[in-house]
């Protein structure tokens, strides 16, 4: 439900047998519209999925619940209006009327003077269409409730007066920064008339614990839920095709999320620093995982990457400290820089045969990684790619590898040998520190026919005493 309450829970067998979805929840003042997934699409997906209820208000008005402090009783409101919006301030005074021609252009009410602090419900009646609007400028942000239409530190007090929003008829968009820095906004219901959620929309809504996105929404904007520290539940419908960068950045309480099959890309830093995210399945529709997408997801222990993914971005899984194993599908051709850097418990990884490059720092500080097979499609090993893989015992470098970056195997303290015996040419060694810190008895095994050339080659000569002809 919109407040995070689990109303029903089905197994996949129960889903397969179902002929209709359950009845919607009932709430005073709200009218259930629909679940944000259809039964048909749930059955087609046939995997774990969170489903949420969408509502409109029983009288069609949009309600903004506020709590005003002593000495802070003079707010104004900015809205995007295409037509007219009547603003009933909830204190028995004469309503204000706003007129406009665009849901993305802000129209301001006059300053309203409340007679006393306390709790009020502002009701917005829309004739036409309306959007919520904001700006990313410091000391402005959301226009939902402010002291001034321009920059003023007192705007923060009024934004923080907003506690709950129930969206009614006529609202089609929640624009960029629409509720940004509404620190005490704890609940919101959104109807199926909504078509877009803009960038920074809920950025910094610290108390927002749960949200249901209607199935009319197709995209989640950049940083839309950044720093929603208590957001524990979100239901994404299969109408959403893209989740932009930083969308859930620093959502520290988000323990699980289901990505629908409609999503084709996961943007940069989308789930970065979601510290309690424990597992995630990336659907077949996703073709790319952006840089730092799961960086700092310390409790991420399980992830399934579909065979539609072709690239894993820089730092994509960096510092996923609980990730013990991962299989990279054959569709992936590149692993970005620092992709798995600092995955301290990563002991097993399967690399695809399609892989052509291993980026800089890709597996740096993967301390328990004991073995790895580099496919013969790889042509380059980046700088510090396996630096400080302290448990790595041996590795075979295929003939396809033509260059090895600086510090690539530095401080691999347990390694017994490097196998280059299938090489037909000496690969380029970028720096003399490529093997710094390996044990004194570690062998660099090379073909006997190339031995003399190998020990004389640039930077390889540093390790002449450890190069062994086989």
Predicted region positions:
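Extracellular ectodomain segments of secreted/surface proteins
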Residues: 56-80, 127-167
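Residue-level recognition of secondary-structure-to-loop junctions
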Residues: 102-116, 120
């Amino acid at each position: 439900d919109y407040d995070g309450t689990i109303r029903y829970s089905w197994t996949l067998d129960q889903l397969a047998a179902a002929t209709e979805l359950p009845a919607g929840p009932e709430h005073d003042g709200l009218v259930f519209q629909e679940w944000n997934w259809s039964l048909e699409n749930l059955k087609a997906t046939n995997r774990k999925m969170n489903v949420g209820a969408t509502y409109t208000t029983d009288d069609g008005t949009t309600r903004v619940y506020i709590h005003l402090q002593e000495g802070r009783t003079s707010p104004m409101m900015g809205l995007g209006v295409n037509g007219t919006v009547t603003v009933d301030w909830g204190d028995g005074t004469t309503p204000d009327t706003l007129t406009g021609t665009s849901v993305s252009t802000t129209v301001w009410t006059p300053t309203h003077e409340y007679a006393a602090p306390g709790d009020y419900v502002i009701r917005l009646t829309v004739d036409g269409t309306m959007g919520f609007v904001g700006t990313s400028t410091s000391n402005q942000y959301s226009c939902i409730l402010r002291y001034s239409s321009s920059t003023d530190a007192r705007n923060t007090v009024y934004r923080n007066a907003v506690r709950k929003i129930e969206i009614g008829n006529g609202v089609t968009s929640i624009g960029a920064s629409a509720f940004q820095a509404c620190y005490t906004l704890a609940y919101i219901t959104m109807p199926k008339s909504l078509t877009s959620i803009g960038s920074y929309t809920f950025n910094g809504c610290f108390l927002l614990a749960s949200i249901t996105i209607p199935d009319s929404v197709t995209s989640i904007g950049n940083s839309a839920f950044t720093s929603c520290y208590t957001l524990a539940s979100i239901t994404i419908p299969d109408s959403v095709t893209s989740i932009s960068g930083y969308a859930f950045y620093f959502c520290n309480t988000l323990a699980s999320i289901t990505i629908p099959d409609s999503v084709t890309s996961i943007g940069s830093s989308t789930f970065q620093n979601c510290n309690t995210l424990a597992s995630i399945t990336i659907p077949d529709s996703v073709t790319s995982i952006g840089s730092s997408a799961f960086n700092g997801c310390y409790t991420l222990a399980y992830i399934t990457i579909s065979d539609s993914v072709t690239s894993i971005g820089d730092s994509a899984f960096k510092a996923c400290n609980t990730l013990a194993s991962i299989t990279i599908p054959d569709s992936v051709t590149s692993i970005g820089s620092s992709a798995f850097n600092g995955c301290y418990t990563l002991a097993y990884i399967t690399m695809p045969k399609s892989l052509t490059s291993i980026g800089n720092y890709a597996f740096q500080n993967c301390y328990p990684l004991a073995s790895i097979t580099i496919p013969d499609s790889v042509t380059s090993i980046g700088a510090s790619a396996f630096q400080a893989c302290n448990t790595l015992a041996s590795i075979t470098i295929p003939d396809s590898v033509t260059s090895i970056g600086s510090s690539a195997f530095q401080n691999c303290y347990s390694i017994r040998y490097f196998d280059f015996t299938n090489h037909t040419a000496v690969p380029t060694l970028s720096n003399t520190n490529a093997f710094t810190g390996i044990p004194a008895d570690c062998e660099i095994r090379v073909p006997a026919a190339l031995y003399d050339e190998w020990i004389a080659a640039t930077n390889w000569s540093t390790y002449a005493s450890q190069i062994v002809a086989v």
